[in-house]
């Protein structure tokens, strides 16, 4: 199991969650994403626009698109829809869709553990050009908008802590998204 660390971040304020929280990125075709952002200018999806959403003749350069994504992020943060968490935290999340429910932990994991092949196992072959685009996004926009999901073998101690926290604390956010997921 890799080391995990709490982190500080901007969290959407509860009253803005339905408008701001992005449906699953890969649930949309590029054309659907483009239409969605036009209809939902306050949605975080406007911060993670990609070149494949544009017709070839209308596509901006990658540099220009990333600058626009950064401007969209600054606009969202300036709008008062997010609050900064001063104290580094670990975050639990629970998603419920129909009969399916999943719970996870949002935390930081040192990149070194992944790069060294320790604890975090590579599960897919990634394309170098996409890795370079993601790095350019993080450097230009200044946000980690593509978290990596990790799983772990069942550990009763972890499950007990998660259960205790969920039973003893009210959720910071509790809403149903535009795609019906709570």
What are the residue ranges of the model-derived segments?
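A cross-family signal for N-terminal binding/gating loops and helix N-caps
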Residues: 1-182
């Amino acid at each position: 199991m890799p080391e995990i660390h709490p982190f500080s971040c901007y969290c959407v304020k509860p009253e803005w969650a339905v408008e701001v929280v992005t449906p699953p990125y890969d649930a949309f075709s590029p054309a659907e994403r483009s239409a969605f952002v036009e209809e939902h200018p306050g949605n975080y999806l406007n911060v993670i626009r990609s070149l494949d959403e544009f017709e070839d003749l209308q596509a901006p350069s990658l540099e220009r698109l990333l600058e626009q994504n950064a401007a969209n992020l600054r606009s969202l943060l300036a709008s008062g829809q997010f609050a900064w968490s001063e104290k580094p935290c670990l975050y639990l999340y629970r998603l419920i869709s129909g009969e399916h429910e999943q719970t996870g932990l949002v935390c930081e994991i040192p990149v070194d553990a992944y790069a060294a092949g320790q604890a975090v196992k590579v599960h897919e072959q990634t394309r170098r050009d996409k890795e370079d685009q993601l790095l350019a996004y993080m450097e230009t926009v200044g946000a980690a908008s593509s978290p990596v999901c990790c799983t772990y073998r069942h550990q009763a101690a972890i499950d007990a802590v998660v259960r205790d926290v969920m039973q003893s604390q009210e959720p910071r956010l509790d809403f149903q998204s535009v795609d019906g997921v709570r």
